[in-house]
């Protein structure tokens, strides 16, 4: 083992806070109060960081000895399970009446069940029959009566609920004589087959089809189950749905809502949610919380909003870290799916996570200018097929890193991700060129950075050793910057811009023009309100008031996707003539909505349009793009540094960066506005995210009367030394892992992480204010070490 010496980084560079100081770095982290160590430990133990995995032997032994599900063949027969599919690794058992499934790993005998197992361990009746019928069935159907359409009238029922099943016992166990089958045995003939029937067909070596006939409501549809090498998939095609009773309409389906659920605090693992950069909910504590969010953001076509940002169509449940778990991926149809999670509390003894596939959604039909109306349903269902896969994770793959690796491998197998990492640590250099400032009559152009200034700043950065620059020009048009996109190609200094493009291309670097064709505002001269602004499902214009802190509210517009596509097509020749790498899109990669345009169009139509737009360009940079844009992505901008910070989250983890590591370069939000100082830089190294700055030649005070006044510190002269020092500090770590993939990340002790890469490099990051020695490596306070 060779410990890399970072001798090129003098100690005086360690205080790389945005507020420059030349004090000794140890003074910056020294305790200022008597209980500083306690305060620091509380901070490092919070959900802003990743925590140490469960290591208590008694907890691990209890899980291994008492909660290791392994039914015998006789017990499976008694419960009605049939071995439907098998391969060299797995057995898949299926019980059709309840639509329940058990996946068995042949090597270990460990079973993952679609039912919440170990019911009744409190030795009392834990749930009433209605709740048990929901829990013990693997298919939930959401429906509504057509004469009573409202959110409160939605019915969520399982097959057992519809069949009015009842049980032989109340489900309580005698811990001295446990019978795992006891909570699930039905009373003879209690399942009403005249209300619902499930049949299987097309059974072969790797798949079978189930047909669900809900005679009570006049629903009939097919679901396919396919065994894969390391898991199984569920396929649902809405074209198979028949609705023969006009009194009822199908809204959505939940497949295996309790698959892999964890009881109370006995499972020493966690739930993985792709919220923001990544979040964990550890299953060793009670939360009494629920979580619900649409994938790929809110659908404003339904006036639905969500705080969460789910850019990846995946989730996971780890029963025991580095031993066993699973993860779920929506391969097709994620734009119509909602992530649902319930955690142990007053209403449930289980942690569970699942998806709901929405084939219809209620919306408000507005009938007058006052906004009066009624709730209605679309007559047509979403016709986008759904496919979700469940993949078993074992040994060192059973972790959030293993989930990132598995999902990355799936993306690579489908050619949905490309290997584009450079050979030197890149830095995004965004520059504000022009903005509009108010005058007595209208506005006038304010030039913050001329083309000559752009060249000068680039050259100085290269002299400071920053040779791999990703240049993003903001406000490059005469239109200005904030809220004025999509810009016209009116170029105040066309030749100067061409010269910049030629120099950047000659250096083998990238230059993007920031442009937004999907989201605009009342300030854009290129948008006509009546023609271009989309209508939502309620036929209202998608114009929303943005209240700003400076009391200058703006009406933000969402355009028809077809209009956005047409405007991009009109600009293709212009951007190619300039020689730009492509466009940098703020919203194209993260905004999907349903809309009305003489007919109602759902998110699939929008998704197809925006991906077609991205495919028309040879290269794209995007801010916080969702997974559907990864095949067309060259640079990921504005990587979130946190999640939505809900109080049920226990850990912050780099799920999204690790999915992209080794393939797509990712960049942090602008470090000009870094309020976390050294901690933020260490997190960038820990998460493998590259630096980013927003710069101007003129002082940012020039922007004070413009809509860009939120950029309160941008002058290159103010940041020149910080940029040089911060880049050198970060690149001294990231240079060694370019093109490498993450093998493992572990928290050795609170505030100290170790990240191992497939090229043999290991990074140690110490978030503590005191030196730490681990693996015979001493890491200075608030610092890192690289081991080759």
What are these regions (language model features)?
Residues 4-22:
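Sec-dependent N-terminal signal peptides of Gram-positive bacterial secreted proteins and lipoproteins
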Residues 83-450, 455-468:
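Carbohydrate-recognition beta-sandwich/jelly-roll modules
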Residues 218, 233-234, 468-477, 511-517, ...:
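Short acidic catalytic loops
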Residues 231-233, 260-264, 465-466, 506-509, ...:
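Structural alpha-beta junctions
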